[in-house]
Design a protein with these regions (language model features):
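PRPP-associated nucleotide enzymes
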Residues: 1-257
Length: 257
């Protein structure tokens, strides 16, 4: 049920898609109702965009859910806004979505939070994919950064190589990443940092998924784990409301590929 009068209005439906299977059908119902009641435009604001990590057919017979879900969203909504989607194998959202998209980046907010809450940080990217992240955050607040090297062995086993960080033992390592899900990479990285005699690290992520027992496994390994409120979680300390509101009010959209 929609409260208010959508006739002649732009309707933005806001729902972070942490549990997309039950949530998406409700969004379809709401979007359909808004159109029937005269909305000019119906848009989806999804701070966390589901299914993006299934970006290829990892095993025979699997669905590439990122593509399927993109078709569903594109056929239901006029525009899509999200924060730091997983774009490992896609250059932009427009490679998947046929509607206008807005991709927001939380790295500046993470950087500002770290600057205000961590003394003498060393920004650490847990794998090669995070190199741009770690570098941009470190550059924004004028601190050093390092990037670890990850080798995966199946879905739940990883090896990590850590460069010599002894010159920065007086600093607090801050592991930064876009998504914390299984937590395996973060856990191995924390152990490797401890082996080098580093201070107990902090962890700052955008999307706090923490599947299964990841949260209970990770909390003893870090001095503190912090996330944005893209996904509701006890670790939320960084709000995205102003970032999202600014993009909505300005009409910001991604360039088309």
């Amino acid at each position: 049920r929609l409260h208010g009068e959508p006739v002649g209005q732009i309707v933005d439906l806001i729902c972070t898609l942490t549990h997309p299977d039950p949530q998406f059908l409700l969004l379809v119902f709401a979007a359909d109702a808004a159109r029937e009641l005269g909305a000019l435009e119906v848009n989806l604001v999804a701070p966390y965009l589901a299914y993006m990590r299934q970006d290829k057919r990892f095993h025979d017979g699997e669905s590439v859910t990122s593509r399927t879900f993109a078709r569903l969203v594109s056929s239901t909504f006029d525009k899509l806004l999200t924060v730091d989607p997983h774009l490992h194998r896609y250059p932009t959202l427009s490679a998947l979505y046929t509607i206008p998209t807005t991709t927001l980046h939380a790295a500046p907010l993470l950087a500002d939070w770290i600057a205000n809450h961590v003394e003498k940080p060393l920004i650490v990217g847990p794998d090669e994919e995070s190199e741009q992240w770690a570098g941009s955050i470190a550059s924004r607040i004028g601190v050093p950064h390092a990037v670890l090297r990850k080798t995966r062995h199946g879905d739940r086993s990883v090896d990590i190589d850590v460069p010599d960080l002894s010159v920065w033992r007086d600093r607090t390592p801050v592991l930064v990443d876009d998504i914390a899900s299984s937590g395996r990479t973060l856990a191995v990285a924390a152990h490797k940092l401890a082996e080098q005699g580093m201070r107990k690290p902090e962890c700052v992520v955008v999307h706090a998924l923490f599947a299964e027992d990841a949260w209970s496994q990770l909390t003893p390994l870090f001095a503190r784990i912090t996330s944005t409120d893209a996904v509701p979680h006890p670790s939320n300390r960084i709000g995205l409301a102003s970032l999202i509101a600014g993009a909505l009010s300005s009409g910001q959209t991604d360039p088309r590929a």
